[in-house]
């Protein structure tokens, strides 16, 4: 059982690293690079966004949910209060991710309004995802 705990916690951390790290990379590296390149900015964001959406939003978030449930089951002592908060925030992140990827992000190429929406949904998603990392730390510390 110890091996299972380690395996699922490892997978959960790797997936969270991919998800949050990807958003940090997009906002701190890709976006500033493309800011001064208006001729390719929109198309580049569309292409990068599609790829990250597939692996980040759909695959990572689904697997984070599964590994999170398994990790919750494997924690001895039952549910911690932080788990309930983390689940609530997680579902908000999923909703915002879908709104960003399937609505605002897709229309951002053709509409300034949607580009602004996509930007702010992405920022909100990053902040909430960092909150999820913090809550994960609290859970591992027994809170």
UniProtKB/Swiss-Prot annotation:
Domain of life: Bacteria
GO CC field: plasma membrane
Subcellular location: Cell membrane
Transmembrane segments: 7-29, 52-74, 87-105, 120-142
A Pfam family recorded for this sequence: DUF4149
Membrane topology reported for the UniProt record: Multi-pass membrane protein
Keywords of the record: Cell membrane, Membrane, Transmembrane, Transmembrane helix
Major localization listed first in the record, in broad terms: membrane
Protein name, as recorded: Uncharacterized protein aq_363
């Amino acid at each position: 059982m110890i091996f299972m705990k380690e395996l699922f916690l490892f997978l959960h951390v790797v997936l969270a690293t991919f998800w949050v790290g990807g958003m940090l990379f997009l906002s701190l590296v890709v976006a500033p690079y493309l800011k001064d390149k208006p001729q390719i900015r929109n198309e580049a964001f569309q292409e990068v966004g599609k790829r990250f959406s597939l692996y980040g939003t759909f695959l990572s978030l689904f697997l984070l949910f599964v590994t999170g449930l398994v990790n919750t089951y494997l924690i001895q002592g039952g549910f911690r209060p932080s788990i309930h908060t983390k689940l609530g925030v997680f579902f908000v992140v999923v909703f915002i991710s879908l709104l960003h990827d399937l609505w605002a992000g897709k229309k951002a190429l053709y509409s300034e309004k949607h580009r602004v929406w996509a930007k702010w949904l992405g920022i909100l998603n990053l902040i909430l995802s960092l909150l999820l990392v913090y809550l994960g730390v609290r859970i591992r510390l027994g809170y």
